[in-house]
Amino acid sequence: LIKDATRINLIETTEMIEMGEEPVRAIRKKKDSSIVRAAVAVKEGQADAFFSAGNTGAILAAGLFIVGRIKGIDRPGLTSILPIAKPGSGAKNFVYLDSGANAESKEKNLLQFAQLGRFYAENVLGVNNPRIALLNNGTEEDKGDRLHKEVHQQLKAQRDLNFVGNVEASALLAGEADVIVSDGWTANAALKATEGTAKMMLTLIKNGIENGGLRAKLGYLFLKPVFKKIAKLMGTSTYGGAVLLGLKAPVVKTHGSADALAVENTIAQIYTMIESKVIEKTVSYFGQVRSEE
């Protein structure tokens, strides 16, 4: 995508938003920070998108208050692309939102997240008629609190959504849906629990190899290619960054520890978003919904 320096324009800034700063106050005070300057460039049409590995809250605030929401969207959803770990499932990854932008959500927010996820899965991931699921504490239709029961019924009633029902956190990576929708608090907690379990299992395997004697070490040598394949599948660098869907342009957050591969894949991710016109299609859809209300 970027073969030489002719497509790179460096803009010097004089301020920096630190990781621990309060997001809204920081973007209002530090107008010459890279996050604010990038968001302003997108708003003014000097850039098509922006991504950063900086302060997550500041990126979200800049996206919301500077780039701006799509009309008809009440709250943007932070969208992660996660791997599907179940063999033979067909798909390699799925859309997961809201993964932490909104601690509390209403029914209409989750319905909007489902539509945002559908457009992303169709246009960026190339999934035809994506399966939409609701993250819940059981697969039965009557499971969950009042919010989840009501959202389940409303998703079921949406004719333009391929709603397949509830999915439990234990099946998060099992490939049961192409888009999994949740409120930000629940989704973030489930995601961190999954990440924590994966790290714990890796630690146990590593300790078992190191303390298991010669047989364990020989076994590791035979299985090393398998471990590398799993690491690539589950690695955060493989799938790009987390997109704040529901804004007027692509705004993407990458990990603070992002390596060159993560940056490359994030740029490719943004390129696909722009080329597929997923934002324009989303704007058109919600504009039509508003006109029919």
Question: What residue ranges belong to the model's regions?
Answer:
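Solvent-exposed alpha-helices and their adjacent loops that cap or buttress functional pockets
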Residues: 2-3, 27, 31, 41-45, ...
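Phosphate/nucleotide-donor binding subsite
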Residues: 3-47
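Short glycine-rich anion-binding loops that position phosphate/pyrophosphate groups of nucleotides
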Residues: 15-16, 55-57, 137-140, 185-188, ...
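Glycine-rich phosphate/nucleotide-binding loop
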Residues: 67-92, 96, 176-180, 184-292
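Metallocofactor- and cofactor-centric catalytic cores in central/energy metabolism, strongly enriched
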Residues: 5-24, 162, 167, 234, ...
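Short glycine/serine/threonine-rich phosphate/pyrophosphate-binding segments
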Residues: 32-45, 49-63, 75-79, 106-107, ...
